[in-house]
UniProtKB/Swiss-Prot annotation:
NCBIfam families: transcriptional regulator NrdR (TIGR00244). A zinc finger (unnamed) spans 3-34. The keyword Lipid biosynthesis does not apply. Residues 49-139 form the ATP-cone domain. The gene is nrdR. GO terms for biological process: negative regulation of DNA-templated transcription. Belongs to the NrdR family. This is Transcriptional repressor NrdR.
Length: 150
């Protein structure tokens, strides 16, 4: 592999480790020319997940878009980004485990709601109101009464 510092063509590996549940290989490399060290990561190239939108359009799954939606739901709640990232990781793993390459945005929304229900009731209601397109106070009241019963 080419050295990012001096451009020398032939670097060598000094350490190799598996990370992220053995899905990524981290390699520590050294350049014999300039003696600088650097890290590379080797990942399995997975088939992209396509999301089928409400209007029938298909677009690639966007982790950042889902993260932004979760962040809006947890505004001013004591929930750190690591928990949100873990939710997204679990959802992606669940989709991959099913062996599907296409999923509706509605199904993703259901998965998010299941995770938020266990994490934070306020975030759950916020996300549900957008995901289920609430247009009246009655819809909020109905959701809240269902939550009280559970």
């Amino acid at each position: 592999m080419r050295c990012p510092f001096c451009g020398y063509e032939d670097t060598f590996v000094i350490d190799t480790r598996e990370i992220e549940d053995q899905r990524v290989i981290r390699r520590r490399r050294e350049c014999p020319n300039c003696k600088n060290r650097f890290t590379t990561y080797e990942r399995i190239e997975e088939k992209p997940i396509m999301v089928i939108k409400k209007d029938g359009r298909r677009e690639p799954f966007d982790r950042n878009k889902l993260l932004a939606g979760l962040q809006r739901a947890v505004v001013k709640r004591n929930i750190d980004n690591e928990k949100l990232e873990a939710i997204i990781d679990e959802i992606i793993a669940n989709i991959r485990k099913q062996g599907i390459s296409e999923i509706t945005s509605k199904e993703i929304g259901k998965m998010v709601l299941e995770k938020l229900k266990d994490l934070d009731a306020v975030a759950y209601v916020r996300f549900a109101s957008v995901y289920q397109e609430f247009s009246s106070l009655e819809e909020f009241a109905k959701l809240l009464s269902q939550m009280k019963k559970e």
